Structures are given as C-alpha cells and as structure tokens.
Design a protein with these regions (language model features):
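Extracytoplasmic small-molecule ligand-binding "clamshell" domains
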Residues: 28-105
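Ligand-binding clefts/hinges and TM-proximal coupling segments of bilobed small-molecule sensing domains
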Residues: 23, 162-175, 215-218, 246-288
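C-terminal motif of bacterial Sec signal peptides marking the signal peptidase cleavage site
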Residues: 16-20
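Extended ligand-binding regions for polar small-molecule ligands
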Residues: 22, 63, 67-72, 139, ...
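A ligand-binding cleft/hinge motif common to bilobed small-molecule-binding domains
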Residues: 92-93, 108-119, 165-168, 194-228
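Acidic, polar ligand-binding/catalytic clefts
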Residues: 79-147
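Periplasmic-binding protein-like
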Residues: 44, 127-135, 208-248, 270-288
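Bilobed "Venus flytrap"/periplasmic-binding protein-like clamshell domains
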Residues: 45-47, 58-75, 131-186, 200-202
C-alpha cells in the first residue's frame, strides 16, 4: 500500500515539474493562432499607443497593430481569428516574459536594437519615430537638448534606452529612472524632475492627455537631424523564423491596404507626423 502511495506521489511530482518546466519555454505565435488563443503584451499607460481603459478594454495604435497582425495570420492560415488575452509588459520585463513563454508577442513601443535582438526575434519594424523631451509648459529654461547639461534632472523608465543615450552625450545630466511612464509624468508634474525623455510618439500622447500642462521639445543633433531613430518592432521568441515571417507579411499587408495609416491618424491625430511607416524585415540599422 505504501509503495502504491509513494508511486502516485512520485508521478504527481514529475507531472508538476514537467508543467513548471514547460511554462518557462518560449511560445510560438503561429501555433497559438492555430489554437485559437493568443497572449499579447503591450503597455497599459501610454495614451494613443497602449491604454487599458476603466472598463478593461484596450485601445491605442500598438493594440490595433497587434490585433491586425494576429488576425491576418489567422486569415492566411484559414483559421478563425483568435481570442486575445492582453498582458501588461513594462519595458524592463519584455525580454524576460518572451523567453519565459508568458506572451506570444509584444507590441509596446518596442524599439529594436542589437542588445534586445540577442534575446528575442523582432517582426517588423512597422514604425519609425525619434526621441524627444517632455517639459512643463511654464519652464522656459529648457528649450533644447543642450539645456539639460547643467545638472538638470531627467526622468525615464527602467529598461528603456533613451535616457542612457542622453546621459552618454551630456554627462552633466542627473538621470532618474522610474518604473512606468505615468510615474515619470507625475514626477514631472510635481517638479521632482525637470524633463522626461522617451520616444516622441509617447510624449505627444501625454501632452494631449494633459492639455496646457506639458510641451514636447524636439531633440536634434548639431546637424539638425533627430537625436535618435527609433524603429518599433514586434517582439517574439528567439529563432521563431516561421512566426517572424508571418508577422512581416502581416505588417506589409497592413501598410499596403492603408490600415496602418488609418490607425496612426485615428490614434495620434494631429501628431501623426511624428511617425512614418517602416520597412518590415529590414534590420540593416541594427548595429552591435
């Protein structure tokens, strides 16, 4: 009897261990589409890009892009549009949740760079934007990037790259990192920091959400070109070539049929000019 009980306990332990191990393996977007259910990561606090509303619905450009992509993949594979579960994915956690198999794909202002591309695959890019500053409208001492190089306090989000680029260029900046963009905006409102930096797409969304309180300052180099180019991609499991190509096909279709521009106009409104369609599958800009 005791042997039988021990055998049952051992079998259960093995099953639990196998399940736990399986949960840490990357997912396949294509397989999940075929199964009828996908888990998509995005931001919950970015006006115009990724927002979770009080009624728990999701809105924003990245939300619409991700939805179009998975539905297009389903159409191409002859299956029904999948049920979508949304998951909040802050900048600092994105590579981890992909590698652990917690999401199928992330669409969340996910700039493609060499460091991230070592850990995950990227579909796209689907959008090109640039870095900018958000300042208080009543602070007239900050009119350009160079004005920060006087011991001013600059806020950005942990796991995001823009502030590090500014710090490298302007050593006099005092860099402060917060866990979310909304926390950065609140710190700026309370005058705990002097400016916030990230992509122009994100900053214009916050400026619209708080009319009259903030303004966006463009960041340029001495030659007048943007301080950075930010290419947004769709993150997924490393080496998942099938899903990556399926995403790229969907992005091309989205741009060709006019859906992408319609999404941009709808979600970014008068600030639609801060983005342009990017070339899916072209990662030549990624440098070590």
């Amino acid at each position: 009897m005791m042997r039988r009980i021990f055998a049952i306990i051992s079998a259960l332990a093995i099953a639990v261990t196998a399940t736990a191990c399986g949960s840490t393996e990357p997912r396949s977007l294509v397989r999940s589409v075929d199964s009828g259910h996908v888990i998509l990561g995005t931001k919950y606090d970015q006006p115009g890009l990724g927002m979770r509303n009080p009624d728990k619905t999701m809105t924003g450009l990245d939300v619409e892009v991700a939805t179009y992509v998975v539905n297009h993949i389903a159409d191409q594979r002859g299956v029904a549009h999948p049920e979508i579960t949304w998951r909040e994915t802050p900048s600092a956690t994105r590579e981890t949740v992909i590698k652990n198999g917690e999401v199928d794909m992330i669409a969340g202002t996910y700039s493609i760079n060499a460091s991230r591309a070592k850990s995950v695959n990227f579909g796209g890019p689907y959008l090109l934007t640039h870095q900018a500053l958000l300042v208080r409208s009543d602070d007239h001492t900050l009119q350009s990037l160079q004005d920060l190089d006087k011991g001013r306090k600059l806020c950005s989000v942990t796991g995001s790259t823009p502030a590090q680029k500014v710090k490298k260029s302007l050593p006099g900046v005092q860099l402060q990192e917060y866990d979310s963009y909304s926390s950065c905006v609140e710190a700026l409102h309370q005058k705990k920091v002097d400016a916030m930096t990230t992509d122009a797409t994100i900053l214009y969304g916050f400026a619209l959400q708080y009319p009259g309180e903030f303004e966006v300052i463009e960041m340029t180099k001495e030659d007048g070109k943007p301080f950075t180019n930010e290419h947004y991609g769709l993150g997924l499991a490393k080496d998942d070539a099938e899903s990556t190509e399926a995403i790229n096909d969907a992005v091309r279709a989205m741009q060709d049929d006019g859906s992408f521009q319609a999404m941009v106009d709808k979600n970014l409104g008068e600030n639609a000019s801060v983005v342009e369609a990017d070339e899916a599958g072209n990662l030549d800009f990624v440098k070590e």
